[in-house]
Amino acid sequence: MLPLLAALLAAACPLPPARGGAVDAPGLLGAPLNASVNASSSDEPAAPRLLASAAPGAPERPEEEAAAPCNISVQRQMLSSLLVRWGRPRGFQCDLLLFSTNAHGRAFFAAAFHRVGPPLLIEHLGLAAGGAQQDLRLCVGCGWVRGRRPGRLRPTGATAGAPTALPAYPAAEPPGPLWLQGEPLHFCCLDFSLEELQGEPGWRLNRKPIESTLVACFMTLVIVVWSVAALIWPVPIIAGFLPNGMEQRRTTASAAAAAPAAVPAGTTAAAAAAAAAAAAAAAVTSGTATK
């Protein structure tokens, strides 16, 4: 009885096929694995899968700025120093190269300055021996990025609440050479000769340091003082060797002062009488005072 009932039930209610069951009845087995991805792709834009495509490219500078005219001026300050100026529109951080070009492929003098700004004073400039003509080339390269730190860029599209079902970003590749990590610089070069700079307003061929000037002034003062002293000190010595005229005048003056005053010849008797009267009066006065 039971086998017959089972056969009747099997004939009346056939079982669903083994293949394609998930397609015919999606509610029984649940959504497929890629359902969330497909749904997000239909409603929202696809999430970035590569770091390069997600990161926004750096805005490229127009060609006018890259091909800007060289606004570089060189001024000679002293015999072995140069003052270099260039325009600020070329960038914030600049690298400067200076080297000689008339040595048949070998630089007689070369100097490099990293991250400098105008104006720049270059001292201890190497000069060619024998006063030969020296041609130099000055190159300035500037960038527009200040203090960029090396590291992996973060995509702007990724947020803190991003779903975990998104594919992970690939690991950052090891950094390449140093000259490939930074921003490309556009160098602007200027060729000049040292002999051409002698007519500049700041050129001082015979300019000396302050120490030499002070020493020269001191030695000049010493020479003047010694010259005046050499003219003055022999005067009293020479006067000591010529005492005849001065002593004769001194002797005559002392004799005239010591001699008594001369009395005229006609007044001798009167003067004697006056002197006797004065002596008598003095004697009387002294006697009266004694009593």
UniProtKB/Swiss-Prot annotation:
Family statement drawn from the similarity comment of this UniProt entry: Belongs to the TMEM158 family.
Gene field: TMEM158
Name of the featured protein: Transmembrane protein 158
Residue positions with a glycan: N71
Protein source organism: Bos taurus
Signal peptide: 1-20
Alphabetically ordered keywords of this record: Glycoprotein, Membrane, Signal, Transmembrane, Transmembrane helix
Job of this protein: Receptor for brain injury-derived neurotrophic peptide (BINP), a synthetic 13-mer peptide.
GO molecular function, one term: peptide binding
